Every structure is written in C-alpha cells, then in structure tokens.
Amino acid sequence: MINIRKTHPLMKIVNNAFIDLPAPSNISSWWNFGSLLGICLIIQILTGLFLAMHYTADTTTAFSSVTHICRDVNYGWLIRYLHANGASMFFICLFLHVGRGLYYGSYLFMETWNIGVLLLFAVMATAFMGYVLPWGQMSFWGATVITNLLSAIPYIGSDLVQWIWGGFSVDKATLTRFFAFHFILPFIIAALAGVHLLFLHETGSNNPTGLQSDADKIPFHPYYTIKDILGVLLLILVLLSLVLFSPDLLGDPDNYTPANPLNTPPHIKPEWYFLFAYAILRSIPNKLGGVLALVLSILILIAAPLLHTAKQRSMMFRPFSQCLFWILVADLLTLTWIGGQPVEHPFIIIGQLASILYFTLILVIMPITSLLENNLLKW
C-alpha cells in the first residue's frame, strides 16, 4: 500500500515541502534562517495572541494594561518579554537571511526575492505598529515622528497623515487602528511566507557555490530537519537568555514613562533594528529627500538582480566582491550606531558619509567590481 503521506491531499503538500523535498547536499547553516523565521513568526503570533487577551487598545488604559500583564497575569511578564525580544530575534534572522541572499546570489530567483522584500516591508510595518501599543513616551513620539514623515509627500501629504491618525494628532483612534493592523498583519505575513516558499520550491534552493545542484540532491528529511532543529534550539537558547537575564537590554527606558503629548523626550529613536534606516533618513537635511532615502534604503533590494553584473552567481569564488560585501555589513553596523546617537558633531558627518557609502557600494562599486572580476577570470 502506498504511503498516506504521499497520497492525502493535505499531507502531500507538507510532504513535498518539508519531507521528500530534494535539497542540495551542500547548503550551509546560512540556509537555516528561513525555518528560524518561520519559528519566530509562530512564537510572535502565539505570544501576541495571549497578550491581546489582556491588552486594551485605549489611550487611558493601554499603559496600565501592559503593567497589569507583567504584574498580575500568570507568566504575563514572560509572554510580554518573549514577544518584545522575539521581535529582535525575528529581525536578526531577517537581516542574516537577506545578507545570505545577497552574498550567494539567491536574488536571481526573482519571484522568491521580490516576495521576500515585500515580506521585509510587512514585518517592518508590523514591528513599528507593535512598538506604539504599550503607549509609553517612545511609543507615542515614535508614532508621531514616523507617521509625520508622510506629510513630505507633495500635495496629499498632510491629508494623508491626518487620515492615518484619524484626527489632528496621534490619539485614541490611531492606537485602536494600529492595534487592529498589528493583529492582522502577522497572518498576512504567514500567507506571504507560504507564497515565498511556493516560488522557492518551483526552482529549488540555491547553494553556496551558486552552481546547478540537480545532479546531487538529498531528501530534506532527515538531513535538514535535524539541522534546522539545532538552529531552532540555538535560537530559543539566545531568546530565553535575553528574556530571563536582561529583558530590557534592547528596549528604551523612556517607554517605561506613560505617553505625554506635552513632554518631548530628549532623543526620539526607534527600536535598534530600524536605526540604520533612521540614520539614513536623518543624514539628509531635506524632509522629502530624507523620506525617499529611507524608503530606497530597503527598496534598493528589489534592484539586486538588475545590478548583478558577474558571470558567477555566488560570491564564493569572488574575493573582491566578498571584501565589498563585508564593508557593506560594517557600513550598516556604523549606520545602526549613528541612528542611536544625538544629532551633533561628529555623528552628523559620520552618518552622511556612511549613507553615501551605502548607496554607492550597492549601485556603483559592487557592479563595477563584478565586471572587473569577469575580466580577471577571462570570462
């Protein structure tokens, strides 16, 4: 009798995606982050669901309801900090996943890559709205500053901002709609992740060499299921270490002060995972220019396949491109640091130079270097 796993309509889909899936025999631990992102999403949806049972999306009670979760709900503190630090783990995995894609040329799977960029935007939107919900000082002022950026859009800008706010300032209407969107978006992300996977399985996975791997495939289970479980255990270890030893390490102390529209915090800054984009935004003195640079800093990923001038797919055998890639990583870390600093000398000029380098590397230096490598290899 044939195995039910291969015949049952539902189990067949799972089987073809996670069990009998032919995978390249040489994919490294950099290929673990897809499954880790799936685990992060599940953790966020589950913890978020339990938080939503006790949270109230009202300006007068939102802050107190979060305090109530931490003090009075059984293991509420654990659920809350798992959710907050789970977001940080989510972004660490996201950045590593995208970095892997750039390094090994995975962006040449166009559909998978474009859905991935869309997913990145969706996760960033979700995280931003989630940060507003505790209604602390940084929640309120972060929401005010970031939504206000839309007023830079010519002609419709100010109307658009008021439409998003649901009034003339960030208030009850804003908080309620942000909660509604924050609740629904993770499910949209889950659906998009399914489409992401669907497109990936049309082509099969890339591998570190960037060469065709059809001649040497192995079944996903047990080889990569075991490998993924190791990754998951390490992820959970890091997450629990954060949650149980220093849950507020990545947060902002200002968010333990209830939101007050009459008192602006000295340094308004977003969560650490947005700091690189925030630094790029601040490095341009013009409002519209800053907003465009902010959006383009992530939207530029869409252009990755168009900027691929190398004859080889992966950077594995391209040492010059490798050097530039790691310079880009260092540049992003510099931008992240600058985003958390006050707007004063020498941080302004460092931020501006790092922003220029970011765009120049991606748009000019890396494509030209790839062409140079083609010539050096006589391709």
From Swiss-Prot:
Q: How does it sit in the membrane?
A: Multi-pass membrane protein
Q: How is the cofactor bound?
A: Binds 2 heme b groups non-covalently.
Membrane-spanning intervals of the chain = 33-53, 77-98, 113-133, 178-198, 226-246, 288-308, 320-340, 347-367
The protein's required cofactor(s) are namely:
heme b
Quote the InterPro entries the UniProt record gives. Answer: Cyt_b/b6_C, Cyt_b/b6_C_sf, Cyt_b/b6_N, Cytb/b6-like_sf, Cytochrome_b, Cytochrome_b_C_euk/bac, Cytochrome_b_N_euk/bac, Di-haem_cyt_TM
- Keyword Cell division applies: no
Entry superkingdom: Eukaryota
Residues noted as binding heme b b562 in the record, renumbered to the chain: 83, 182
Q: Name one GO biological process term.
A: mitochondrial electron transport, ubiquinol to cytochrome c
Residues annotated to bind heme b b566: 97, 196
Provide the binding site for a ubiquinone.
201
**Keywords tagged on the record:** Electron transport, Heme, Iron, Membrane, Metal-binding, Mitochondrion, Mitochondrion inner membrane, Respiratory chain, Transmembrane, Transmembrane helix, Transport, Ubiquinone
Location in the cell reads:
Mitochondrion inner membrane
One Gene Ontology cellular component annotation held by this UniProt entry:
respiratory chain complex III
GO molecular function ontology, one term from the record: ubiquinol-cytochrome-c reductase activity
State the similarity comment: Belongs to the cytochrome b family.
Further comment found in the protein's record: Heme 1 (or BL or b562) is low-potential and absorbs at about 562 nm, and heme 2 (or BH or b566) is high-potential and absorbs at about 566 nm.
Which PANTHER family does the entry mention? CYTOCHROME B (PTHR19271:SF16)
Q: How does it assemble?
A: The cytochrome bc1 complex contains 11 subunits: 3 respiratory subunits (MT-CYB, CYC1 and UQCRFS1), 2 core proteins (UQCRC1 and UQCRC2) and 6 low-molecular weight proteins (UQCRH/QCR6, UQCRB/QCR7, UQCRQ/QCR8, UQCR10/QCR9, UQCR11/QCR10 and a cleavage product of UQCRFS1). This cytochrome bc1 complex then forms a dimer.
Q: What job does this protein perform?
A: Component of the ubiquinol-cytochrome c reductase complex (complex III or cytochrome b-c1 complex) that is part of the mitochondrial respiratory chain. The b-c1 complex mediates electron transfer from ubiquinol to cytochrome c. Contributes to the generation of a proton gradient across the mitochondrial membrane that is then used for ATP synthesis.
Q: What is this protein called?
A: Cytochrome b
The opening ranks of the lineage are: Eukaryota, Metazoa, Chordata, Craniata, Vertebrata
